[in-house]
């Protein structure tokens, strides 16, 4: 039984690529045809590629690997947060801060600062501080939470990246490649598939398409975790 069906992909509009004038020739092998100036993605290939990505993620998660979900475009923000939280993984759904991976120590300092402010609030220190100072701290906390909330529990570099639209997330992709972190990506007809280890050829602009594919990656993690729980129970 395949991980995803052709019907699901069609209903979510996964097959709609970009306009033919905005394409990357390297994506040619994933294109089925052209219709009304738009490339149509070969969904048989997508089914196969989703399966490959799913198996890789399941295997990784079964061995305790951590995945960072990355999608900062409007169409991806909600799905990335929801699905990463559902499978208890990390995410970046606002702006990617340069150095999130390659300058991890600095990012950790910012996370430490976020934790300090959270602790001050919990311990009631806000109640005794001047109002102006409290407003300033709350603003700082909001900003840090916005950009780092999805990775504040990420104590070390992730074992893989799941990226929606590698063209938009090119800084994240470049950092992962520099550190030899494998990348799974939803890759539309205007992207370069060579940058990605596990290419999922698909529409990266439709909310439903992004949600469907992101949920499959989360499912793979959850399947691995359920397998672990079952193994522990059997012992």
From Swiss-Prot:
The keyword Ribonucleoprotein applies. GO terms for molecular function: structural constituent of ribosome. This is Small ribosomal subunit protein uS2. Keywords: Ribonucleoprotein, Ribosomal protein. GO terms for biological process: translation. The gene is rpsB. InterPro entries: Ribosomal_uS2, Ribosomal_uS2_bac/mit/plastid, Ribosomal_uS2_CS, Ribosomal_uS2_flav_dom_sf. One of its GO terms (cellular component) is cytosolic small ribosomal subunit. Belongs to the universal ribosomal protein uS2 family. It comes from the Bacteria.
């Amino acid at each position: 039984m395949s991980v995803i069906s052709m019907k699901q992909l069609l209903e979510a509009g996964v097959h709609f690529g970009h306009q033919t004038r905005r394409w990357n020739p390297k994506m040619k092998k994933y294109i089925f045809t052209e219709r009304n100036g738009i490339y149509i993605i070969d969904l048989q290939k997508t089914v196969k590629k989703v399966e490959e990505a799913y198996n890789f993620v399941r295997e990784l998660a079964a061995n305790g690997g951590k995945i960072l979900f990355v999608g900062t475009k409007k169409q991806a923000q909600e799905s990335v947060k929801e699905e990463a939280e559902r499978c208890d993984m990390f995410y970046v759904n606002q702006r990617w801060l340069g150095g999130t991976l390659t300058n991890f120590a600095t990012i950790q300092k910012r996370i430490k600062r976020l934790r300090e402010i959270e602790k001050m609030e919990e311990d009631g220190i806000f109640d005794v501080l001047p109002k102006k100072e409290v407003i300033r701290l709350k603003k700082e906390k909001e900003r840090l939470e916005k950009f780092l909330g999805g990775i504040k529990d990420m104590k070390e570099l992730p074992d893989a990246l799941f990226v929606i639209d590698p063209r938009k997330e090119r800084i994240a992709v470049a950092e992962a490649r520099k550190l030899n972190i494998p990348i799974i990506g939803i890759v539309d007809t205007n992207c370069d598939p060579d940058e990605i280890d596990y290419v999922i050829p698909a529409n990266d602009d439709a909310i439903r398409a992004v949600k469907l594919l992101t949920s499959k990656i989360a499912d793979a993690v959850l399947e691995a975790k359920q397998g672990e729980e079952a193994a522990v129970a059997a012992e």
